[in-house]
């Protein structure tokens, strides 16, 4: 039964606010009551004729329905699992596992480098009589002592080579033939055959670094030690030809890299080379201590690559298969 107009005149309409539900609103003189009414936003009104009384139990506005619908859609997003999504997921998983593996490899390589550096400070031992590769390979970067004499007439130079001795960034030692401004990397390593006293075998000794303007033997005759002597040195192995480096030309005395077998064959020595220790440096002579622990370590670049690939492929996978 519809309410008479007089009943609506007693209903309080509040402008520009959404009110709470009220249980009972009584009207005087009519005997009617309204239960569980909902009040919504209305425009200001002076009389019941101007009032925009919203009907009972009115549905939600379109704006509210759209907002609620958007929230429900967002909350319902999930992964669209299928055979294709599972197969594509193996790409970031595989890349992540390789990144973890390279992390362990990096730690192993850093520990190896520290171990090799520690060998340089160990107590020197006698060079074994067995000079085979199998015997000397475990001694790489180990300190040894040798006794014998240099064969200066057969010396040669590997160049270009940089300096690696501890005194590279310090001033030249007193009496050295190098001034502070000459302590650059533009030079080479002086290799001199060395005849062992006990066995008579001839090995190769890297006496140290020389600047290029001292390559001529006539400029350093007074720096060549004579007679029998004992010196500490570091065991080294042969090296492969670096990329973009030319081939050695033994007939012309041109050496770019340390090929022990080629050197031994040309000069009639054993395929053994030792780096003279830094303390063997003589005033005005080559600078010893040119041992550079050069262990290839690209694991940091590898793990960065794999983890980056993991992130990119995972974001692509989520974008494609999340619905």
UniProtKB/Swiss-Prot annotation:
Biased composition regions of type Basic and acidic residues, renumbered to the chain: 57-71
Predominant location: mitochondrion
Keyword Transmembrane applies: yes
GO CC, alphabetical: mitochondrial inner membrane; mitochondrion
Topology with respect to the bilayer: Multi-pass membrane protein
Keywords: Membrane, Mitochondrion, Mitochondrion inner membrane, Transmembrane, Transmembrane helix
Pfam families for the chain: SURF1
Compartments (UniProt record): Mitochondrion inner membrane
Chain intervals for the UniProt region annotation (Disordered): 57-76
Keyword Transferase (UniProt): no
One of the GO biological process terms: mitochondrial cytochrome c oxidase assembly
Function noted in UniProt: Probably involved in the biogenesis of the COX complex.
Record family assignment: Belongs to the SURF1 family.
PANTHER family associated with the record: SURFEIT LOCUS PROTEIN, SURFEIT LOCUS PROTEIN 1
Protein name (record): SURF1-like protein
Organism expressing this protein natively: Caenorhabditis elegans
Gene designation: sft-1
């Amino acid at each position: 039964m519809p309410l008479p107009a007089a009943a609506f005149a007693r209903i309080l309409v509040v402008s520009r606010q959404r009110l709470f539900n009220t249980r009972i609103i009584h009207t005087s003189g009519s005997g009617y009551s309204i239960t569980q009414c909902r009040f919504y936003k209305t425009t200001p009104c002076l009389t019941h004729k101007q009032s925009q009384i919203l009907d009972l139990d009115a549905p939600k506005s379109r704006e509210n329905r759209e907002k609620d619908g958007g929230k429900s859609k967002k909350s319902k997003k999930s992964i669209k699992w299928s055979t294709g999504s599972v197969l594509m997921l193996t790409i970031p998983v595989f890349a992540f596992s390789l990144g973890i593996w390279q992390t362990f490899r990096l730690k192993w390589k850093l520990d190896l480098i520290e171990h090799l550096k520690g060998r340089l400070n160990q107590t020197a031992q006698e060079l074994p009589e067995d000079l085979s590769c199998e015997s000397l390979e475990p001694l790489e970067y180990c300190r040894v002592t040798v006794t014998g004499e240099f064969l200066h007439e057969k010396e040669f130079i590997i160049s270009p080579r940089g300096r690696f001795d501890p005194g590279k960034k310090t001033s030249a030692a007193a009496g050295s033939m190098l001034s502070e401004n000459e302590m650059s990397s533009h030079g080479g390593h002086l290799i001199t055959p060395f005849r062992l006293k006990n066995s008579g075998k001839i090995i190769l000794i890297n006496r140290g670094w020389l600047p290029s303007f001292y390559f001529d033997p006539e400029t350093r005759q007074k720096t060549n030690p004579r007679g029998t002597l004992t010196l500490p040195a570091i065991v080294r192995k042969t090296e492969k030809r670096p990329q973009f480096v030319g081939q050695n030309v033994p007939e012309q005395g041109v050496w770019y890299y340390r090929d022990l077998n080629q050197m031994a064959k040309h000069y009639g020595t054993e395929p053994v080379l030792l780096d003279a220790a830094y303390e063997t440096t003589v005033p005005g002579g080559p600078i010893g201590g040119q041992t550079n622990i050069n262990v290839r370590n690209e694991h940091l670049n590898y793990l960065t690559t794999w983890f980056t690939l993991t992130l990119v492929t995972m974001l692509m996978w989520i974008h494609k298969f999340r619905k």
